[in-house]
Design a protein with these regions (language model features):
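Bacterial Sec-dependent N-terminal signal peptides
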Residues: 1-21
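N-terminal accessory beta-strand-rich subdomains and adjacent acidic, glycine-rich linkers
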Residues: 21-302
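Solvent-exposed beta-strand/loop surfaces of large extracellular or lumenal domains
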Residues: 91, 101-103, 170-178, 183, ...
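An acidic-aromatic substrate-binding cleft motif
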Residues: 267-360, 368, 372
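Aromatic- and carboxylate-enriched substrate-binding clefts and catalytic-loop regions
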Residues: 376-566
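Catalytic cores of secreted or luminal carbohydrate-active enzymes
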Residues: 568-615
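Carbohydrate-binding surface patches
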Residues: 618-660, 703-704
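C-terminal beta-strand-rich structural cap/linker in extracellular carbohydrate-active enzymes
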Residues: 684-710
Length: 710
């Protein structure tokens, strides 16, 4: 080495000495932590020696508050740090989820914990990195200390500096809704596409920046790397969005504020959620990853024997389409619950949740092996429930006059079926919490063990947002209280999941995205369900409510919308849009019209011992095989976008030397989600391990397959 080179290396030593690299167990993912010259925490990330995240800053900006910070003038945790300790460790366990895609999950990572001290404020924080074979998670931790006890977060400044103008599958950043259609653009095109991307007609919309996007964010680099940015274990903290510097392609965390405009009220000891980056050169690895679940705490429920998968039906779809109604009467322009004599109200004749009608659904469920019947609109208050910012909307215990709650539950139980409770809150959160004990008492009295919740409209307390710290605490409070009563929760319009179903597995479903209901409101693009598994489903399963076999709604209603899949494409969703709670959402009479196709919905499992992603490309196609829990039977589903797809299914996952009866539900020649959606064919054959099936999926179509071991 020349003298000049030696001198230059020596000059760099003070900076280089603070750097620390931690690699994944397989050595392919590497994260390097360092401090800048000003003492600002910085990290970068590589995959197979290719840069994935360029040097990115870390830190938090605190709000000045004489009560929370005791008058301290230093109001940030951004720079001025020195490393006081680093700890490297390895963790490797295998755990068994109560339900999910896999019978058991390996949690294997290498960890770097960096202790940092800020001399100007005498504060200490820890930044912890966990590096997995498929990515990494980082979080901030705040030990208890006299100089940092209570504090308020003004902004979190966690950066994700991209290496180029990647392709992105994104939703507009919004404090209140994820019910938007995914956009597929380059990062540089987000700004120009943003306004048109927003569903301004949603019941609650609060965008914050023309380059703001939601997580989980799926990306693809020009050289073929797949990246995914999300968060895990969001507890007592606001939901994270991302704001893009579209000149430098740097994302920065953007937290949801509460009604005060502030973003987090903290008390040490505490920590933030994990900020996650997944990476692979194979899109299938993103779908198969358990990184988000692994970053959550283990199950906190001692007894989980009462938690079970659910396949259900209900009156929901006929109301969504407009044939029936939630409300019992049209007599009142507005109502006050304690001033209405419902026995004297004039029925409108369209109320779906009436005793005789619900009995038909119970009979249908019993005859077809469905465990539960969801009944929305059973309780008084639906006459003026939505978009009023009304506090006392529902009491959650009083049925309409035509809904005999005791008789219906008795009838259902006699048939081996249960009713599923519905608690729409109209986002009046305080009202729901005031009535929660009485509502759960009623459920236990009549034998309900599952509830679908809802949060349509703007939040009360007024000015708050669906994804704020306080609202996230509310959602978790409901799940915890339900667990005490052995009640499973399926939350709609709540915050997007971040893997908390591992810790509280009675959270068996979430909506938190644009679901099947939008097919009655003009439809979602055919690529919608081959994007969501890369984005929304990263944090947990979705109650997507598939199974609409009569895709042309005008055949049985006055609704002119149509479902943007083929009939067989709907069957595929039971595999692609996985979850332990699945709805057979169509009307019983429509299933009778297509009884041979409905057989797959009856047969398909909703809980799994194993899952194999066979083909995948975001926004184009997904093919997945799943092994039904406790059996040797497999089910395979393939779904594609509006361009169609030729799927090559290699049956390598079957047991060697065994034969399987294969029933294939496929798009027929000429099938098309717009022109010929109900053209399908069903074929049977005997197959074995190593066989290869080539299946053509129509535009907006797919296929479904059962493989029953002989």
């Amino acid at each position: 080495m020349k003298p000049l080179q030696i001198l230059f290396a020596l000059l760099l030593l003070p900076f280089m000495a603070v750097g620390q690299t931690i690699k994944s167990p397989n050595g392919k993912v590497a994260v390097t932590f360092s401090l800048s010259a000003s003492g600002q925490p910085t990290y970068e990330m590589t995959f197979k020696n290719r840069q994935v995240v360029k040097p990115s800053h870390l830190g938090l900006e605190l709000a000045k508050d004489k009560h929370a910070s005791k008058g301290l003038q230093e109001t940030d945790l951004m720079d001025g740090f020195k490393i006081t300790d680093t700890k490297i460790s390895t963790f490797d366990e295998t755990w068994k989820p109560v339900w999910g895609q896999y019978k058991q999950i390996r949690n294997h990572y290498n960890e770097l914990a960096v202790s940092l001290h800020q001399a100007s404020s005498n504060r200490t924080i820890i930044i912890r990195f966990r590096v997995y074979d498929e990515g990494m998670g980082l979080r901030y931790e705040f030990p208890q200390q006299s100089s940092l006890n209570y504090f308020i977060i003004k902004e979190e400044h966690t950066q994700f500096a991209m290496t180029g103008d990647h392709k992105a599958w994104w939703l507009p950043g919004d404090y209140d809704t994820q019910e938007q259609e995914t956009q597929e653009t380059k990062l540089s095109e987000i700004r120009e596409c943003f306004k048109k991307a927003v569903n301004w007609d949603n019941s609650s919309v609060s965008v914050f920046s023309p380059t703001g996007v939601q997580t989980s964010l799926q990306l693809k680099t020009q050289d073929g790397l797949y990246l995914n940015i999300h968060e895990a274990a969001c507890v007592n903290y606001a939901t994270m969005h991302l704001n893009l510097d579209d000149k430098n392609f740097v994302f920065e965390s953007w937290l949801t504020p509460d009604a005060t405009g502030l973003k987090g009220f903290m008390q040490t000891p505490c920590s933030t959620p994990w900020r996650t980056v997944m990476v692979s050169d194979d899109a299938r690895d993103i779908l198969a990853s358990n990184l988000i679940l692994n970053l959550n705490e283990p199950c906190k429920l001692q007894d989980t024997s009462w938690i079970h998968p659910v396949k259900y039906c209900g009156v929901w779809w006929e109301m969504i389409v407009g044939k029936s109604s939630w409300n019992y009467t049209d007599e009142f322009p507005s109502i006050k619950l304690d001033q209405i004599d419902w026995s004297k109200a004039k029925p409108n004749g369209r109320h779906a949740a009436n005793t005789e009608h619900v009995k038909k659904y119970i009979d249908f469920a019993a005859a077809n092996g469905l465990q539960q019947v969801l009944v929305e609109g059973w309780n008084v208050g639906w006459e003026d429930w939505a978009n009023r910012w009304k506090d006392y909307v529902f009491d959650f215990v009083t049925p309409y006059p035509d809904f005999d709650i005791k008789a219906l539950n008795d009838y259902a139980h006699s048939k081996g079926v249960k009713l599923m409770m519905h608690h729409e809150t109209s986002s009046s959160v305080g009202n729901y919490e005031r009535h929660l004990n009485a509502a759960f008492d009623l459920m236990q009295k009549y034998g309900y063990d599952a509830v679908k919740g809802g949060y349509v409209g703007d939040i009360i307390p007024r000015g708050d947002h669906h994804f704020s710290q306080e609202m996230n605490n509310h959602y978790l409070y409901i799940v915890k209280e339900a667990a005490k009563r052995h009640i499973m929760v399926n939350a709609h319009e709540a915050t997007r999941p971040t893997g908390l179903c591992r810790t509280y597995p009675n959270l068996i479903g979430n909506e938190s995205a644009r679901g099947t209901e939008y097919e009655a409101f003009g439809g979602s693009k055919p690529d919608h369900t081959v994007v969501l598994p890369f984005t929304r489903l990263q944090g947990g399963p979705m109650d997507y409510t598939p199974g609409i076999l009569e895709t042309q709604l005008h055949t049985w209603s006055e609704n002119t919308s149509y479902v943007h899949t083929t009939l067989v494409g709907q069957l595929a969703l039971y595999l692609v849009m996985w979850g332990p709670i699945q709805m057979a959402a169509d009307l019983p009479e429509n299933y009778q019209k297509y009884a041979d196709a409905f057989q797959f919905i009856k047969d398909v499992a909703v809980d799994w011992d194993d899952s194999r992603y066979l083909e995948a490309e975001p926004g184009d196609y997904i093919t997945v095989a799943r092994k039904a829990k406790g059996t040797d039977n497999w089910f395979v589903g393939g779904k594609c976008d509006e361009n169609g797809h030729r799927s090559v299914v290699k049956l390598d996952f079957l047991d060697k030397g065994k034969k399987y009866e294969c029933t294939l539900y496929a798009d027929a020649p000429g099938a098309d989600y717009e022109k010929n959606p109900k053209a399908y064919r069903i074929t049977k054959r005997i197959v074995k391990k190593g066989d290869v099936l080539t299946i053509d999926e129509a535009r907006g179509g797919g296929f479904a397959m059962s493989l029953i071991k002989k």
